[in-house]
Amino acid sequence: MLHSQVPGSVLAVFAHPDDTESACGGTLARWAGAGAEITVVICCSGDKGSSDAKAKPAALIRRRAKEAAAAMGTLGLPTPVNLGHPDGSIDESLRRQIRGEVVELIRQRRAEVVLCPDPTAVLFGRHYVNHRDHRDVGWAALDAAAHEAGLPHYWPDRGAPHQASELWLAGTLEPDTWVDISDSLETKARALMCHESQLEEPGEWLRRMVERRAESDGKAAGVQYAEGFRRILLG
């Protein structure tokens, strides 16, 4: 189904500093341009996101935070909320903590739509295994949105209950909803190029990769370029 409605308030919860743009940057840029209030939450600091053995984690955290802020500005969004948890550290205790943090943000922002990674998506063909942080953050956000933020006895110290209407899972193997990003594809590509620490040679190859992925989703939706999601109705 091609989805054209624009929600009033959106909370996008992802693991690493560049995940949001990759998963749904075109959709968020389109929604922001139409007046949606959007908060992006980055759960992990990006402290391990480098193949350079000499890179210092503290410097990497600072650099990636600046890159994320620049990318959000490119999409027309405010500076993201950085929870600052170390990469690869999400055990059961920390996942519970993230649930509470997401519940509080859902309640504060009165989010209508919560966007997060699909935690059930693990193997993408023969060449990509979904990062564990993506899956762990997806489960935490899913549980917070579906079961906890709307009930008063969950996290009673984290604000008044609020039930989001919809949960959108990005990076999914089972898309059933698409957003036309034909007018925001270039914006998405420019946002991803802000993450220079993650790119060996920023340039045309990244734009082509973004275009190919969006073109594939676009064929499923009957438009030139799209992003696909698994949409769960909660309200």
Describe these PLM feature segments.
Residues M1-L11, E92-G235:
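Metal-dependent de-N-acetylase/amidase catalytic core
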Residues M1-R109, R230:
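Active-site rim/loop-helix segments in enzyme catalytic domains that contact anionic ligands
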